[in-house]
Amino acid sequence: MDKRRAHVWISGRVHGVAFRAYTQEAAYHLGIGGWVRNLPDGRVEAVFEGDADKVARMVEWCRKGSPMSRVTEVEVREEDFRGEFVRFEITFGRWGA
C-alpha cells in the first residue's frame, strides 16, 4: 500500500464550529495519523499521514468540513511521507508551519 503525507490549510468558517474535533474523528475512523490546529488568521492547518487512498479521502472530507462549517478553500501541499505519527491529535500552542 502506498503511503502519503498531505499538509493542508482550510479557509472559510472553520473556527468555532467543531471543525478540529470532527477532523480528529474522521481521521480516527480512517486510521490516519497527524494533527490539526487553528491558525490566528482564521484558517485551520492539518497534516495527514497514512495509506494514500485514506489520506485522499481525508483531504476530500476537508473540502466538505464539519456540519456547521463553510469551507471556501483547501490548499494542499504534498510532502515526503515520514511515518512520524501513531495517532491523530488536536494541537494547541505555537502558530506557524
From Swiss-Prot:
Alphabetical keyword list: Hydrolase
Cysteines engaged in disulfide bonds, as pairs: none
A Pfam entry, by short name: Acylphosphatase
Domain Acylphosphatase-like residues, every copy: 5-92
Catalytic function, reaction form: an acyl phosphate + H2O = a carboxylate + phosphate + H(+)
EC number: 3.6.1.7
Transmembrane parts of this sequence: none
Similarity comment: Belongs to the acylphosphatase family.
Protein name: Acylphosphatase
Organism: Syntrophobacter fumaroxidans (strain DSM 10017 / MPOB)
Lineage, highest ranks first: Bacteria, Pseudomonadati, Thermodesulfobacteriota, Syntrophobacteria, Syntrophobacterales
